[in-house]
Amino acid sequence: MRATVLCFSGLDPSGGAGLQADIEAIGQSGAHAAIACTALTVQNSQQVFGFEATSKELLLAQAHAVVGDLPIKAVKSGMLGTTDNIAALAEFLREHPEYKYVLDPVLVANSGGSLGDQATLVKAFVELIPLADIITPNTVELRALTGLDDLDTATQKLFEMGAKAI
C-alpha cells in the first residue's frame, strides 16, 4: 500500500486550495492523501465569505479514525481556523512523534480573505513550530509569525522559535 499523508486543512468549495489542493499534490507525488477537515469555508476563487470551524473533538475523531486504518507516514496542515484546532493538532502530533510533519501556517486565503483571527492564530502557531519538520510560510505568514519585516531576519527568528527547516 502507498504511504499516506494525513492532511489537516479546510474545505475550499472552489477546489483551488485547502484539502482539494493537498489531495491533488500528494496524489501526484505517488502517496495517498487522507483528510481531517478543519473547517468548511464559504468562498470562491475571488473572495472568502466566511467559514465554520470543525470542533476540536470532531477533528481529533477524524484523525484517530484514519490512523487506525491507514499507514500514515506524514502529517501536513494548512488552514486550522481556530486556536482549539491548533491545540488539537499539537496534541495529536505529540501522541504520534513518529510522523513527519509539514506546517503550512495558513492565515489568509489566496484571495486575501481572512481564515481566522490572525493575531490569535499567530500566537497559537508558536506551539506547532517546534513540532514541524518543515515549515512553509509565504512572506505574509513569515512576517506575521515573527513580527519582523525583513525576510532574512524573520527567517532567522523562525529558526530561533524552533523551526528545523523552512
PLM region descriptions:
Residues 33, 101-103, 135, 166:
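Hydrophobic faces of well-ordered beta-strands that scaffold small-molecule active sites
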Residues 42-43, 107-109, 142:
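A short, flexible beta-alpha/helix-coil linker loop
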Residues 62-127, 137:
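Glycine/small-residue-rich loop that forms an oxyanion/phosphate-binding "nest" at active or ligand-binding sites
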Residues 118-166:
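Conserved phosphate/ATP/ADP-binding segment of small-molecule kinases
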